Amino acid sequence: MQKQEHVVFKRAKAHGHDEPHGGAWKVAFADFMIALMALFLVLWVMQVVDKEERKAIVAHLHSSSVFDKSYGNPFDTSQSISPIDLAQDSSVPSKHNSNHVVSSYFQGDGDGPEINSLVPGTFDTQEQLAALAKVIEEMTAQINAQGNVNVTVTPQGLRIVLQDDYKQHMFSRGGAELTPFFEDLLLALAPLFEQVTNPLIISGHTDAIPFKKRFGRQSNWALSASRADVARKTLVEGGMPDDRVMQVTGMSDRALLNPDEPDSSENRRIELFILTTPAAKVLETLFGNQDDSELQKAKQKAEFNQPVIRQEVIRYSADAEKQEAKIQAL
């Protein structure tokens, strides 16, 4: 007997209008927000970095890859090229904590040169200045600050240049507040200047970017002078005697290290010049008392050798006779 087939009809259930929708739109919206955030981040970075820093960032991105192990961990913030130090909050001023990498360098960790090994005194010869420069270079290499410190031995003394790079800014943009890295660097250099009794010149330098009108009367002259004085105060706070400083100068943009690119970060710097004794005497002659200087002696000798006019001799004789008569009358 043939089996009968049964047809089953299933009534579709009508969906209500208040049934919740799926979450696919949330994923799309999240992607949109991430893209928008990335856009604003790129615009912000382009605003805060200069031309040289942009070149360095582009070169780094072109030369590195997340798949290349030779470039290390891409999430390592210690090697970040970001203008903001992701390893620490750069908005918080330094409290001079000795745990900082720069300050702890001279706390007896056992690596690098010993500042206490320097014999206190005046460094005048080229050999002495070269040895002092070597100590500073080894210290900066130990703390990975080679790109921020340049030491040069000159006939007049030792020139130490502290400058910006694309990783570290010395001061807040347009201000005279030291960033924590350079503040600790100056505090670490202070014990060295305590041992070296040579006079010190501190000069501040800016780039050629002028201040906008909204800043009123502020200028690169005032800014460079303020930054140089902040460097002096930091060194004194670190232990350097205040009488070591012979001159604090603001140079504005009149001595550019990179004149081809006046707006370059190389031009924003602080220079510490350790003067030899002869160079310090020359500076004293220019700005100090010149009564006993060679120039004054030569001037007096020239005046003494000038020919005397007859009328001046007669007037001098008459004045002398009057003075003698007054004395006799007394």
UniProtKB/Swiss-Prot annotation:
* Protein name per the record: Chemotaxis protein LafU
Keywords, sorted A to Z: Cell inner membrane, Cell membrane, Chemotaxis, Flagellar rotation, Membrane, Transmembrane, Transmembrane helix
> Induction of this protein: by what?
Under conditions in which the polar flagellum is not functional.
Q: Where located?
A: Cell inner membrane
Periplasmic domain ranges by topology: 49-330
Q: Which residues cross the membrane?
A: 27-48
Its membrane topology = Single-pass type II membrane protein
Give me the Gene Ontology terms describing cellular component.
Answer: plasma membrane
According to its UniProt entry, the protein's GO biological process terms are:
archaeal or bacterial-type flagellum-dependent cell motility; chemotaxis
Which coarse location class applies to the principal site listed for this UniProt protein?
membrane
Asked if the record carries the keyword Transmembrane helix, the reply is yes
What the protein does comes down to: Probable integral membrane protein required for the rotation of the flagellar motor. Might be a linker that fastens the torque-generating machinery to the cell wall.
Does this UniProt record's set of keywords contain Transmembrane?
yes
